[in-house]
């Protein structure tokens, strides 16, 4: 909905369905709002509430740039996906999540099906009472971790069995998602950002995985803040130039 204002032929954006959709789906995701970047969230809300421009072409340009900004920021949010390939590794996940107590680890993907094309995928979401098993058809990793036209990529993917997870590692490399892989000396080192050799049943290995997960979370948050500042400064200047 667009409303014309008096003076200098300004146009005020009263409501924009696209931005509201992005705001509701990408910033809440069915979880509490405080779990995500409050500065970014407040900025988007401010832009939704009142946007002033002069010409319709400029309006379309600014809205397109804002949507691109949101899409880029979503890619670098500090969320970590952990992939386990068997029940023993799944128990390692539970211990790590319990130790972390971080909202960024609420979502996990589990089972060997995630690392192979032909098997069904089983997505485990942490509920109030343990884990809920949801069986879904194989959509490969791009569809699994993304939304149509608005991919929300995690900061890192932790693969607790990199030997069986070659397909997942390749897909992550194509999508530009950093990976942490655990396995023996036969794992594909070039495509892994952080390879860990040996099993992770020992306290030392679990500590290493935990440390890398924390690093991944903070790295994702750092990238999020950096790219947001870059886009914000660039398009704020462009936006103000249309008001002169």
Swiss-Prot record:
One of its GO terms (molecular function) is structural constituent of ribosome. GO terms for cellular component: mitochondrial small ribosomal subunit. It is found in: Mitochondrion. CDD domains: RPS2 (cd01425). Transmembrane segments: none annotated. The keyword Zinc does not apply. Belongs to the universal ribosomal protein uS2 family. This is Small ribosomal subunit protein uS2m. The gene is mrps2.
């Amino acid at each position: 909905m667009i409303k014309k204002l008096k003076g200098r032929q300004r146009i005020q954006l009263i409501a924009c369905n696209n931005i509201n959709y992005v705001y509701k789906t990408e910033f809440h995701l069915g979880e509490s709002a405080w779990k995500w970047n409050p500065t970014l969230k407040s900025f988007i809300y401010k832009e939704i509430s009142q946007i002033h421009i002069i010409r319709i072409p400029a309006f379309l340009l600014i809205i397109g740039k804002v949507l691109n900004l949101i899409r880029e920021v979503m890619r670098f949010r500090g969320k970590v996906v952990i992939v386990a390939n068997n029940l023993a590794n799944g128990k390692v996940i539970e211990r790590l999540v319990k130790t972390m107590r971080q909202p960024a680890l609420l979502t996990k993907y589990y089972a060997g099906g995630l690392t192979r094309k032909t098997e069904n995928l089983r997505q485990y979401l942490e509920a109030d009472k343990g884990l809920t098993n949801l069986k879904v058809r194989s959509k490969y990793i791009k569809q699994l971790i993304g939304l149509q036209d608005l991919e929300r990529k995690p900061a890192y993917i932790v693969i607790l069995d990199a030997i069986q997870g070659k397909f997942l590692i390749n897909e992550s490399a194509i999508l530009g998602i950093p990976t942490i892989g655990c396995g023996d000396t036969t794992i594909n080192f070039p495509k892994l950002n952080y390879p860990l050799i040996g099993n992770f049943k020992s306290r030392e290995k679990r500590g290493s995985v935990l440390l890398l997960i924390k690093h991944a979370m903070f790295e994702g948050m750092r990238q999020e803040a950096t790219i947001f500042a870059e886009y914000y400064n660039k398009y704020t200047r462009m936006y103000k130039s249309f008001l002169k």
